[in-house]
Amino acid sequence: MRNGVVLFGLFFIGYSSCVLASLVEKSDVESTHAEQWDSNGKRTLQADDPERILAEERNMEQALLPAAEAIGKIKVSEKAVPRASLGSTLNPMKWPKRILDKVRLWLARIRLNLLKRTTVGEDSIDRAMMNGLTPFYLKKIKNDIMHYSSSVPHDKIKIEEDYDFYVKHFFGQFKGLYKDPPVFAVDKWNKLEEGMTKAEQNGNRRASDKVSRNIDKGLSIDQLFSLDISPFVYMRLLEKRGVFKDVENNMDKIDHLKDYVKVYKEHLMA
């Protein structure tokens, strides 16, 4: 049984490496189509197609997680393990969980690298926000990397700084919500939307449709939070519906958004 676990673990590690290498290579090749040069002659990466990024994540999970989870459920009899190795990192009883943790770490790393391509510069970050990228999604990736790494990640400080910057920038967009009367800087976002590629516009539309469906269902704040509905896309939806042009008759909708932003931030910081 022990030899079987060892052989299967080695096979899975090799297979996982091949799959991830092919996915990363494909992603890198495709991303060259999005490369441009700025006015200083430096190469920059513009936002990739959000749909392609989600598809790549699904492909990785479908290719790796089922097998990894199956390994994680393997039970190795303690009798099959020499007593001298029970407390060692080489203990075969610990291998299934270690393999599963390693796969989850790889997937989190791939997600982070894909997201870096969509958040190069403030405009790209704003486009990502419009397409529904939420602080909680980034927090999950950050936590997975920290949790499943066998030691402190070499780029821990950079990951934390990038996350903190995104969160600060994200909630900074709600300042106008607390003015009297509440306002929304529509011109900036409309101009940014006009400059989007068709793929980005489609991602923007899908994010708005998702929020619209759930808001129209009358879901509670807790239900919206459980679905990780973007407070920013929610605010843009209200603007598109003319709520901020008629504040007096729409204060109930604005107050609901304020409550949601408050709850969302509280849970995020918890």
UniProtKB/Swiss-Prot annotation:
Protein name as it appears in the record: Secreted RxLR effector protein 149
Motif (RxLR-dEER): 43-58
Sequence similarity: Belongs to the RxLR effector family.
Domain of life: Eukaryota
UniProt keyword ATP-binding, yes or no: no
Entry text on domains: The RxLR-dEER motif acts to carry the protein into the host cell cytoplasm through binding to cell surface phosphatidylinositol-3-phosphate.
Keywords: Host cytoplasm, Host nucleus, Secreted, Signal, Virulence
GO terms under cellular component: extracellular region; host cell cytoplasm; host cell nucleus
Signal sequence extent: 1-21
Main location: secreted
Keyword Secreted on entry: yes
Function: Secreted effector that completely suppresses the host cell death induced by cell death-inducing proteins.
Organism: Plasmopara viticola
Localization (cell): Secreted; Host nucleus; Host cytoplasm
